[in-house]
Amino acid sequence: MTHQSRQTRACLLSLGGGRPGSSVDLQNMEDSGPDRRGSVFAGLVGASQVLGLVSVVITGVWMGHYRGGFAWDGSAREFNLHPLCMVLGLVLLHGDAILVYRVFSNEAKKKVKLLHGTIHLLALITSIVGVVAVFDFHSASLIPHLYSLHSWGGLTTLILFSSQWVMGLLFFLFPGASSWLRATYLPIHVFCGLTLLVMAIGTSLLGITEKLLFSIESSYPQFTPEGVLANILGVFLVLFGVLLCYLVTREEYRRPPNPEEEALSVHFKTLTEGGAPATP
């Protein structure tokens, strides 16, 4: 046990009032706490992946079975690629890119950054394919572009998502940004990532409702199988978003800082507060 650990143990024992059971309680905390949190975390991550993957599968079944399948020919089958690509890209891959910092918390920071940026790039490419598909379909069918709230929200989300990816690339993967700039932009980057996930899910819900009203407006109130399946998709998307936000915002699931990151934090505090870094 290190000197710092012994000091921490002594402090906790003193807070316990020196009772005989205090050391036993402390030992139980050390032995069972991390394992219990780890198993809960693994279960929550697994549940999030099930929700996300099932959402993609439901979207594929909806568009493939009930809406005629997929093609790239300007027909309604090309439109069917739009919801599939958007759920896969802006929801599932986007959420997983955010989650890698929690799942791989003990891996080298540079590797996690590369994985984070790569998954986001795949999400961006997939989403662009989905947007091109719907624009092609509208052009071929002589349908006006960007007239609905769903289209406004979707295009705004995609543009901001693209900007977020470029800013992250410039600040965190390229070596040009200073430590002060990175530390300043990091909270904004994290907040924008979660906000964009919420926007993507909200826009998806608008799109689901819009598609149902266009396709089965007369039979939708009769609880048709297609309508029920699409409603379940919406519920799963919401649950996926809630679970992702929970995992990302819980303090105990945050990535523990390594010595290099702690040194950077001390350096940033010195720059902003004018104090001298404490010696170890």
What do these predicted ranges mean?
Residues 47-61, 80-98, 115-132, 152-170, ...:
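Hydrophobic alpha-helical cores of multi-pass transmembrane domains in eukaryotic membrane proteins
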Residues 163-188, 198-225:
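Juxtamembrane loop segments immediately following a transmembrane helix
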Residues 98-102, 170-177, 242-261:
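Transmembrane-helix exit/juxtamembrane "anchor" motif
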